[in-house]
Structures are given as structure tokens and as C-alpha cells.
Amino acid sequence: VASQNQWVYDLENLTYAIVKTRCEKKLKTKYPKLKFTQEEQSDSATASFPTVLVQALEPIEQNEDLEGRRTNTVLFTAQVIVTTNKSRSEALNVAQTVADEYKAMSFKLAPAPFARKNGKLWTATLRARRSFDWNDRL
């Protein structure tokens, strides 16, 4: 029997799957080695660039029922880190495409995509935040 709060536990994987599918359709032609992941470390011996790491950051319950059993609203934040060995513009282009997909699902960006260089790698980071109610549809 699924928990009445299962929708909360499924948010990370559901939003990841939607963003991954939509972005791959838009980016795979330009970036054939594009890799989306939820894992911070790859088992692969060779890196694939650009890589898009998507993870939830502390989903916060905002509205429970009077008995405290059911979660009615959750503030959900996804952090996205795009890593590439090519250029700042490549990192930002991929991150901006991901950001647009979150915006299409009514997320707010805080921060919007920004890029930094560390050694030979460029990273672009963004966070997307949105409240979800138990009966919201994506």
C-alpha cells in the first residue's frame, strides 16, 4: 500500500525525468555526448561532457493536515550543475536550456544560471524552486 505522502517522495525523480526528456530532445543534436545524471560520481572510467547533475535540495513540508499525517504542500528545490571541458558558453547554453524547462513548469530560478571555471572544467549552476500541492499535475 502506497503512503498518502508518496507524491512527496516521488517529486525528485518525476521532475528529473521530465526535465531530462525535454532537454535531451533539444540538446542531443548539438551535444551528442550530453549526459544527465542524479549521481555525483560516475562508475564510468571516461567522463562524458557536457554532464548535467540534477539533485533535490531539502524538500520542505509547508502544509500538513491537522493530525500531521498527510503532507499537503512541499517547497521543492532542484539544484542543477552543468560541467563541461569545452567553454563557458557551452556550460551556460546547456544550463539555460535546463532553466527554461523548469520555468515551463512554473519554477522560480534562484540563482539563475551562472558559470565558473575550476582547473580545466567549466561549471554552470542554477537552482529552481517551486511549491507543490498534493494534487498538482506537471
Model-found features: residue ranges?
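Ser/Thr- (and often Asn-) enriched beta-sheet segments in non-cytosolic proteins
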Residues: 26, 35, 53, 73-77, ...
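Small/polar-rich, solvent-exposed N-terminal microdomains that initiate assembly or binding
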Residues: 1-66, 89
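Short, solvent-exposed beta-strand/turn "edge" segments of beta-rich domains on protein surfaces
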Residues: 64-72, 117-119
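Acidic-leaning, charged glycine-interspersed low-complexity segments
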Residues: 93-138
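Long, charged/polar, surface-exposed segments that mediate recognition or autoinhibition
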Residues: 86-87, 94
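Intrinsically disordered, low-complexity acidic/polar segments
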Residues: 63, 87-89, 133-137
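Short, low-complexity, polar/charged sequence segments that are solvent-exposed and flexible
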Residues: 56-59, 71-77, 97-101
